[in-house]
């Protein structure tokens, strides 16, 4: 899709209007609390019997979560790297074994993005991480673990499954600059449209909301 065609499909994302709505959402929330902001999308034109499900990891321009929920599952070679870079990690050897099952389950529950060093399969199966709705990154030779960690902060999962009628993704939180939230929305919607078989023709409605507020219609 050309850049012009993409811009035409997302013309409803006028910056002035959307940033104004974001500001109103933020003002309606308790300033002492940080609340997640997400986009909800109603879809049309899909046949659940024929169309393929969509599961994508989207990397947005700005951090989407207020708290670090990224963890390195570290082998011996990467423990020192994590310590030097002040990255949260758990050593594989320290949480392996039947007697550490509760610790492993707690780590899995508390974190969203997992950086998996070689040997991670001693404690976690990839399919179980995915089944829990988490986002894994298997560290390859040459990967910069700091860069991967920063990417994790900006990543969110997009799923279009089951009846294909609705999907959603996180775009930020009420502690962020409204302009940054807007940029995350714009990039996220651009990626979503690129994954849809008929582009913006598959969009039925687009809304923005916080964890606590009713949705506000954008499209």
From Swiss-Prot:
It is found in: Cytoplasm. InterPro entries: Ribosomal_uL1, Ribosomal_uL1-like, Ribosomal_uL1/biogenesis, Ribosomal_uL1_3-a/b-sand. Its main location: cytoplasm. The keyword Protein biosynthesis does not apply. Coiled coil: none annotated. The keyword Ribonucleoprotein applies. One of its GO terms (molecular function) is RNA binding. GO terms for cellular component: cytoplasm; large ribosomal subunit. Keywords: Cytoplasm, Ribonucleoprotein, Ribosomal protein. Pfam families: Ribosomal_L1. GO terms for biological process: translation. Belongs to the universal ribosomal protein uL1 family. Component of the large ribosomal subunit. This is Large ribosomal subunit protein uL1. It comes from Encephalitozoon cuniculi (strain GB-M1).
